[in-house]
């Protein structure tokens, strides 16, 4: 049976890391946890569960996952986040594919991540979900192939790989627990929006006042209605507002960075002009 390496990146995930590790450890050969200097018991819990833990200062989402990926000894890699859990049915499906030696029919496998509200014990009917490539052969794809972003961490195929028809969506699902509290969601929104704003600056993105003023409205509509957060009731309304605010924040922070940069340039030009005038008056 082809062996699988699993990796998880963490930061103060003591409350959730055990659930994540326990959902993968029986179907993989190794579990690697790359921790970005947690101040809680994340490292101790992960080690107690048999994971190999490496502490690494934060490199950004893409950098951290690329580093973790590089530590995996096997070609087949399974990545989940600390706030995710493979269902028993998904564990069995993956185990069956590899036990029957059929894994190489595809280069990568997508997983449906069902969004679980923090107060739920099981998925709600019609719960929203995301499809993400999380099980893949690193000979053909890698997180390290992501360019121009430190936040949009995704598995990207090598340029010379024809992956048409080579990605399979697994039938069973994993669970994504959206947050532990409103405070945690707001803290994450603030951090993540700052990282996204840095990416936008690097990409040379511009911003209109119209987009800034309509961003929250659009993303609330998208989260609550299109992504079906309404299935969580009023809690879904609250979470949609936080999500929309996070999208607004990234643009507000982009605007702030652009204004600061503009002011720095203006001051530099004024200083240069002043020195030029002083030099001319001296002559």
UniProtKB/Swiss-Prot annotation:
Its EC number is 2.4.-.-. Signal peptide: none annotated. Keywords: Glycosyltransferase, Transferase. It holds the Pfam family Glycos_transf_2. GO terms for molecular function: glycosyltransferase activity. It is an enzyme of class 2 (transferase). Belongs to the glycosyltransferase 2 family. WaaE/KdtX subfamily. This is Uncharacterized glycosyltransferase RF_0337. It comes from Rickettsia felis (strain ATCC VR-1525 / URRWXCal2). The lineage of its organism: Bacteria, Pseudomonadati, Pseudomonadota, Alphaproteobacteria, Rickettsiales.
């Amino acid at each position: 049976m082809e062996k699988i390496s699993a990796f998880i990146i963490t930061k103060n995930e003591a409350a959730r890391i055990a659930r994540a590790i326990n959902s993968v450890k029986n179907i993989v050969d190794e579990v690697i946890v790359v921790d970005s200097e947690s101040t809680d018991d994340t490292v101790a819990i992960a080690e107690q569960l048999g994971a190999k833990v490496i502490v690494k200062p934060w490199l950004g989402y893409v950098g951290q996952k690329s580093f973790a990926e590089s530590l995996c000894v096997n070609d087949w890699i399974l990545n989940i986040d600390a706030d995710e859990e493979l269902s028993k049915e998904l564990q069995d499906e993956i185990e069956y594919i590899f036990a029957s030696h059929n894994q190489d029919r595809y280069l990568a496998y997508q997983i449906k991540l069902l969004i679980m509200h923090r107060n739920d014990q099981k998925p709600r009917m019609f719960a929203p979900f995301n499809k993400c490539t999380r099980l893949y052969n690193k000979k053909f794809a890698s997180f390290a192939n992501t360019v121009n972003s430190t936040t949009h961490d995704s598995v990207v195929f090598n340029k010379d790989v024809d992956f048409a028809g080579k990605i399979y969506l697994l039938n069973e699902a994993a669970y994504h627990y959206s947050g532990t509290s409103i405070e945690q969601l707001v803290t994450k929104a603030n951090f993540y929006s700052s990282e996204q704003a840095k990416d936008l600056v690097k990409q040379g993105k511009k911003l209109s006042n119209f987009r800034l003023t309509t961003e929250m409205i659009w993303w609330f509509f998208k989260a609550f209605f299109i992504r079906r957060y309404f299935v969580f009731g009023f809690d879904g309304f609250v979470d949609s507002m936080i999500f929309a605010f996070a999208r607004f924040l990234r643009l507000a922070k982009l605007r702030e960075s652009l204004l600061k940069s503009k002011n720095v340039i203006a001051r530099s030009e004024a200083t240069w002009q002043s020195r030029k005038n002083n030099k001319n008056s001296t002559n």
